[in-house]
Design a protein with these regions (language model features):
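Bacterial N-terminal signal peptides
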Residues: 4-15
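Aromatic- and Gly/Pro-enriched helix-to-coil junctions and flexible linker segments
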Residues: 14-146
Length: 146
C-alpha cells in the first residue's frame, strides 16, 4: 500500500513540476477585437475556386460559425462572441502550426495537413490571410494597420 501511495505522490509531483511546452504558447492570448476586425472578415472572403468559410462552417462541422443576420454583411457583437468561442476550440494560442484553424486549410507542401473538406485556401504561409491568422494566434493586439 505504501508503495502505491509513494508512486502516486511521485507522479503528482512530476506533473506539477513540469513546465509548459512553450513559453510563447502559455503567454499568448487571443484578442477578441482583433478577431472581430481582422479574423472574422477572412471567414466571409470569397476565394476563386472555393466556397467562403461561412458556407460550410455554418452547421455540421466542428468549427461552427453563427449564420449572418438577414441582410447583414457581418456579425453583430453577440454572434461575434459566439464565433470567438467556437474558433478558440481550434486554436492553440502561441502555436500557429499546431492550430487546426491554420493547418487544415493550408496546402500540405506549405506545412498544412490533409484534413479540410473545403479544400486548401492558402498555398503558402506567406498568404496575407494566413499571416493575419498567424499574428492573431501569436497574440496580435493591434486592430488597425498602424
Amino acid at each position: 500500500m505504501y508503495t502505491t501511495v509513494f508512486y502516486w505522490a511521485l507522479m503528482l509531483a512530476g506533473m506539477l513540476s513540469q513546465q509548459p511546452a512553450s513559453s510563447s504558447a502559455s503567454s499568448a492570448s487571443l484578442n477578441f477585437e482583433v478577431f472581430r476586425t481582422k479574423i472574422q472578415p477572412i471567414f466571409l472572403a470569397r476565394r476563386p475556386g472555393h466556397a467562403r468559410c461561412i458556407a460550410c462552417h455554418g452547421s455540421g462541422t466542428p468549427l461552427r460559425l453563427q449564420p449572418l443576420p438577414p441582410g447583414s454583411a457581418t456579425w453583430n457583437e453577440e454572434d461575434s462572441r459566439k464565433n470567438f468561442q467556437a474558433v478558440q476550440r481550434v486554436v492553440l494560442p502561441g502555436v500557429p502550426l499546431k492550430s487546426r484553424l491554420l493547418i487544415h486549410p493550408l496546402a500540405e507542401e506549405a506545412g498544412g495537413d490533409f484534413y479540410h473538406n473545403g479544400g486548401k485556401h492558402w498555398s503558402s504561409q506567406n498568404d496575407p490571410e494566413w499571416q493575419a491568422l498567424k499574428a492573431w494566434v501569436l497574440g496580435e493586439t493591434r486592430t488597425s494597420g498602424d
